[in-house]
Each structure stands twice: as structure tokens, then as C-alpha cells.
Design a protein with these regions (language model features):
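TIR-domain catalytic/interaction hotspot
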Residues: 5, 59-61
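Short secondary-structure boundary/capping segments
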Residues: 8-9, 88
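Local sequence-structure signature of Cys/Sec-based thiol-disulfide redox active-site neighborhoods
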Residues: 9-46
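Acidic beta-strand-to-loop metal/phosphate-binding motif
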Residues: 19, 73-77
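Thiol-based oxidoreductase modules, predominantly thioredoxin-like and allied folds used
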Residues: 44-59, 69
């Protein structure tokens, strides 16, 4: 299985998947930590977190998969939602909460 297939399997295996630097309990960058906090603020109690620092192939592969140059990257129901700035904007506009409701509820 190549890295793109592995990523496709990861983003479709769970409803909410976050590619981040570090873990939700110990984020390794401010943007990843902020995205985790926004998910928690939206009432997403459980999500799959993929630590890109643990796997260099995933770290580079996720950028090609989404055609997005940075991490973190949020996926809901297999669809790329965005990075930290987009997730924050969506939260501020109430869009992230709506997306969460349709994904979880």
C-alpha cells in the first residue's frame, strides 16, 4: 500500500480525523493545539488524531493528498475541511458546529 492509499484509508476510517503535529494531549505546535481546542469547544469528544511527526511519509503525503501545504489538516466524513485558519474561521462563523452536528449527530 502506498502512502496515498494509507491516507485515504485513514481519512475514511473515522468520522473526524485530524492530521497534526503531536497528539491531542501534547500538541507540538500552536496551530495543532488550537485546532484540538476548537474541536473540543464544538463538542467533538473523540476523534482520530494522526501525529505527522511520527511518520515522515505521512507528513509529506498528506500535503500532496489534500493539495494543502501545511498541517494541521481536518477531515470530516472523508472530506478535507481545512487547516488551522480555516477551522478557526468556520468556528467563529458557526459553520464548524453545523458540520460537527451533521457528522456526529
Amino acid at each position: 500500500m502506498n502512502v496515498q492509499e494509507k491516507i485515504r484509508n485513514q481519512v475514511t476510517a473515522d468520522t473526524v480525523v485530524l492530521y497534526m503535529k503531536g497528539t491531542p494531549q501534547a500538541p507540538q505546535c500552536g496551530f495543532s493545539g488550537a485546532t484540538v481546542q476548537l474541536l473540543k469547544a464544538c463538542g467533538v469528544p473523540d476523534f482520530t488524531a494522526v501525529n505527522v511527526l511520527a511518520d515522515p511519509e505521512i507528513r509529506e503525503g498528506i500535503k500532496a493528498y489534500s493539495n494543502w501545504p501545511t498541517v494541521p489538516q481536518l477531515y470530516i466524513k472523508g472530506e478535507f475541511v481545512g487547516g488551522a485558519d480555516i477551522v478557526r474561521e468556520m468556528y467563529q462563523q458557526g459553520e464548524l458546529q453545523k458540520l460537527r452536528s451533521s457528522a456526529v449527530g
